[in-house]
Curated annotation (Swiss-Prot):
Function according to Swiss-Prot or TrEMBL: May be involved in gonadal development.
CDD domains: homeodomain, LIM1_Lhx2, LIM2_Lhx2_Lhx9
Source organism of this protein record: Gallus gallus (Chicken)
Chain intervals for the UniProt region annotation (Disordered): 40-60, 330-363, 378-397
Domain LIM zinc-binding: start-end pairs: 69-130, 131-193
DNA-binding region ranges: 267-326
Principal location class: nucleus
Pfam families: Homeodomain (PF00046), LIM (PF00412)
Bias (Low complexity): 353-363
UniProt-recorded name of the protein: LIM/homeobox protein Lhx9
GO biological process: dorsal spinal cord interneuron anterior axon guidance; negative regulation of DNA-templated transcription; neuron differentiation; regulation of transcription by RNA polymerase II; spinal cord motor neuron differentiation
Length: 397
């Protein structure tokens, strides 16, 4: 689309020499000079117009008085000095408009034609775009940023929770069911309302046709399971693993029992993988407090990104391992399972005890610049890093 110059009057010359004072020149010479200047100006103007028309002859043939151009919009003759050339047709400046929104396209950089109709960029992509948003079902332009979930594509503003309309950004956990997007909280509520609470993650997968309803955070979810015999079935806790992409050789695993369904089947224990910074944070806090309360669990959940239930189960298992280790030390310091000798329990004067009520600083290992001050109660012992009891605790994990 371009603006092309049309006709110009050739019978008049716009150049008029200014009044000048000629000294020592007769009147006849002055008249000859003025006629020569006027002739040269006419020649230059004709050459300039001829060059301009020849430069655009590939786009539009020069107009002639015998065959005036017709506007493709209104069908009238074009007698204006300037007109528009779009899709190999001539248009009045006022006639080139979008057929949908009637937007004037004379100042736009682009316009689109489809089946003889003219569209602006927004209406063309809205009506004829190949990819459409899975939420609003409108077209998505090629230069627009999108969010992808499985095979669906969404506008950034349309990638929201179906229940609460919360905008989901990169890194947020979300769930999908029936091609609908849910935030983490409402997806958990949806699962709890649809399936009985005693069903484990394995039974949920079987009930859903072999494919469970996991959470998504941009990468695949890593989960491991192994059969294990138990003397008596116990009601277990099924926790969805939110930590994806973990290397099983570089991570610790937490085993959880599951209730069998139906009762004739063997029980299975699922394993949750932890990342290094999560383990360091939990172990550091376990050295200070073996039984954190709800407030401490909330702070740890914010640091590690784990749920409070996951943290509760981990601390419960850690306390059980710690008690078993103390019993083994009291029975002779030899582990009957593998025959390895364990360090002896520390003496009363082996480490310096922290006075009651002393504030102990716990550094967030995930972000070294953040420091959390926790008050240690009088019934807990805080040992120095070099004490034997600290070495014993490290060997547990």
């Amino acid at each position: 689309m371009e603006i092309v110059g049309c006709r110009a009057e050739e019978n008049t010359c716009p150049f008029r020499p200014p009044a000048m004072l000629f000294h020592g020149i007769s009147g006849g010479h002055i008249q000859g000079i003025m006629e020569e200047m006027e002739r040269r100006s006419k020649t230059e103007s004709r050459l300039a117009k001829g060059g301009q028309m020849n430069g655009r002859e590939t786009n539009m043939p020069p107009m002639s008085p015998e065959k005036p151009a017709l506007c493709a919009g209104c069908g009238g003759k074009i007698s204006d000095r300037y007109y528009l050339l779009a899709v190999d047709k001539q248009w009045h400046l006022r006639c080139l408009k979008c057929c949908e929104c009637k937007l004037a396209l004379e100042s736009e950089l682009t316009c689109f034609a489809k089946d003889g109709s003219i569209y602006c960029k927004e209406d063309y992509y809205r009506r004829f775009s190949v990819q459409r948003c899975a939420r609003c079902h409108l077209g998505i332009s090629a230069s627009e940023m999108v969010m992808r979930a499985r095979e669906s594509v969404y506008h950034l503003s349309c990638f929201t929770c179906t229940t609460c309309n919360k905008t989901l950004t990169t890194g947020d956990h979300f769930g999908m069911k029936d091609n609908l997007v849910y935030c983490r909280a409402h997806f958990e509520s949806l699962l709890q309302g649809e399936y009985p609470p005693q069903l484990s993650y394995t039974e949920l997968a079987a009930k859903s046709g072999g494919l469970a309803l996991p959470y998504f955070n941009g990468t695949g979810t890593v989960q491991k399971g192994r059969p294990r015999k138990r003397k008596s079935p116990a009601l277990g806790v099924d926790i969805v693993n939110y930590n994806s992409g973990c290397n099983e050789n570089e991570a610790d695993h937490m085993d959880r029992d599951q209730q069998p369904y139906p009762p004739s089947q063997k029980t299975k224990r699922m394993a949750t993988s932890f990342k290094h910074h999560q383990l360091r944070t939990m172990k550091s806090y376990f050295a200070i407090n073996h039984n954190p309360d709800a407030k401490d669990l909330k702070q740890l959940a914010q640091k590690t990104g784990l749920t409070k239930r996951v943290l509760q189960v981990w601390f419960q298992n850690a306390r059980a391992k710690f008690r078993r280790n103390l019993l083994r030390q009291e029975n002779g310091g030899v582990d009957k399972a593998d025959g390895t000798s364990l360090p002896a329990p520390p003496s009363a004067d082996s480490g310096a005890l922290t006075p009651p009520g002393t504030a102990t600083t716990l550094t967030d290992l995930t972000n070294p610049t953040i420091t959390v001050v926790t008050s240690v109660t009088s019934n807990l012992d805080s040992h120095e890093p070099g004490s034997p009891s600290q070495t014993t605790l490290t060997n547990l994990f």
